[in-house]
């Protein structure tokens, strides 16, 4: 009877440096203005939101001055006091989003951002309803600023509320100069672990150490000769005759290699650059904006062919179908 206290000999891919890169991707850096300047979407939305807030600020100051209590016989015009709270709240909201984007931590705080944006949208729309029909120019200008800010807020809610793999967001991020080295690290963290040897836990609390390298999600059975020292299935051990080992089994020719298909009916564009794992001969490298031919779009890894005829598998969330 074998002991359950032995060590496990993991495949070499378990200690792959790419897994360390996936873990280190959560260690956020400081504020980098390049994340704002190099991202057209972030630069445009933060600029418009800041301009809208400035319009609201000056409109609120003059609108509060122009309010009338009706003592002089003029119509009663009262400034809504909660608009001051909305003004201050949106200031910290815009500042917080600016810091989050500049520090490249949107995926860490995106849930909180969407919640705060929803609160800001309610306050902005309520202020619009109370100011736009006042008949006072300063209050109407304030309402116009809130309308512009509400439009940006709705866009932000859609952007931060969508997954990085969503087609609209992936298309927007493809124009950013800095997302190439930051977004895939987080977005591919779980799939990179699956590819490098960590998939779902089994009944013994351990992990299946075989990467998914088939383009269609199906892969041939693999034979392992490393000793697991106690992680084997006892039920299967009783069915194996004595003297029988994996060394006596003839290994199929070309095991681990994927036969490339002959038809590639799909075309996809790379939204990020990808460097193939040197330990996996089935992967291919490609650069950002490169167009690949795809044979099958099912599964996490697609069988692809480059323009130079090189074939292999590519991660699906680095590509967008054309």
UniProtKB/Swiss-Prot annotation:
Domain SH3: 263-322
Residue ranges with Polar residues bias: 1-16, 191-250
PROSITE patterns: SH3
Gene3D superfamilies to which the protein is assigned, alphabetical: SH3 Domains (2.30.30.40)
Record note on quaternary structure: Forms homooligomers.
Encoding gene per record: sho1
Stretches of the chain found on the membrane's Cytoplasmic side: 1-40, 103-107, 162-322
Pfam families: SH3_1
GO biological process annotation, one example: regulation of actin filament polymerization
UniProt keyword list: Cell membrane, Membrane, SH3 domain, Stress response, Transmembrane, Transmembrane helix
Its biological purpose: Plasma membrane osmosensor that activates the high osmolarity glycerol (HOG) MAPK signaling pathway in response to high osmolarity.
Organism: Neurospora crassa (strain ATCC 24698 / 74-OR23-1A / CBS 708.71 / DSM 1257 / FGSC 987)
Topological domain ranges for the Extracellular compartment: 62-81, 129-140
Protein's cellular compartments: Cell membrane
Origin superkingdom: Eukaryota
Transmembrane region(s): 41-61, 82-102, 108-128, 141-161
Stated name of the protein: High osmolarity signaling protein sho1
Main location: membrane
Annotated segments matching region Disordered: 1-20, 191-261
GO cellular component: plasma membrane
Family that this chain belongs to: Belongs to the SHO1 family.
